[in-house]
């Protein structure tokens, strides 16, 4: 399981930054977490192992943010190695940027 090219990474980046994700917007950062979840679920590995992808709501968070994580279990021998895919999603308001905020 790997990204196939620079172009795919570029496409993913462009799609993610195009998502309105400021927390005061409807759904805020959750929309990005959902995008990541859907992306993972579209990969062949996770189609075969959908239980290894989760989207969860952050506890005690008045903005009701979400995060996504996934994990890939190793297949060589009985090493038991696992790769965990998780990242921090955070956005900030753009009001301070005035005319260049868009």
Features from the language model and the residues they span:
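Acidic/His- and Gly-rich active-site-bordering loop/insert found
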Residues: 2-102
């Amino acid at each position: 399981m790997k990204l196939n090219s620079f172009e795919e990474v570029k496409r993913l980046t462009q799609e993610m930054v195009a998502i309105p994700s400021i927390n005061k917007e409807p759904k805020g950062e959750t929309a990005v977490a959902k995008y990541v979840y859907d992306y993972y679920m579209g990969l062949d590995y996770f189609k075969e192992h959908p239980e290894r992808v989760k989207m969860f709501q952050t506890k005690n968070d008045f903005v009701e943010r979400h995060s996504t994580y996934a994990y890939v279990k190793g297949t060589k021998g009985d090493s038991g190695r696992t790769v965990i895919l998780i990242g921090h999603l955070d956005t900030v308001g753009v009001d301070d940027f005035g005319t260049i905020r868009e």
